């Protein structure tokens, strides 16, 4: 957790430093004057945030075989971080198309709260426990004109396909375990929307962005006594990222 906090602080410090650098010359000559006329831009992205599930449970848990001890099932948000390569195509004065293949490492838990005579249960998914995503987002970016010469505001929207690179290993662990193991789908499709700022520095452009993602697919894959208490499982996440282009 300390490493995660350190990463968040580092990203914030980098964005503040870049913003200060861009605004230092904000009322003077603009930086990177020929940048916006280029058709293609490339760079890299670093991000951190939270990952969680939206759970739809059985309306009456007591009606399920073997589940009469359950009281409630709750998701518990976990941290997430990732990195990727930025590919940007200029579509017009105010629009860009962005493709940012990335690796992400989300972590989260699903907690089962039982009656007092039955111990509570937690299923963990993430990192070595079962999720390392290859993310393939395709986003449309709408940007404003330059403000103070070296700053732009923008919004992005689009969709992302994600594939769990360690799904086979997680499935083997689930099949060999003597206990129930929560196994989520290897594939996910997420709708995404975000807002951010572009800062034109002396030698590069830095962008800061907040983005929300919502899964469109049911991630629950197998059945079981306690897993059967869940009707559907969809992912959601918030991410703060910085990109260098």
Each model region followed by its residue ranges:
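Cleavable N-terminal export/targeting peptides
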Residues: 1-36
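Gram-negative (and chloroplast) outer-membrane scaffold detector with strong preference
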Residues: 25-40, 48-54, 86-168, 241-245
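Extracellular/periplasm-exposed beta-strand and loop segments of Gram-negative cell-envelope proteins
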Residues: 52-78, 106-134, 162-188, 218-237
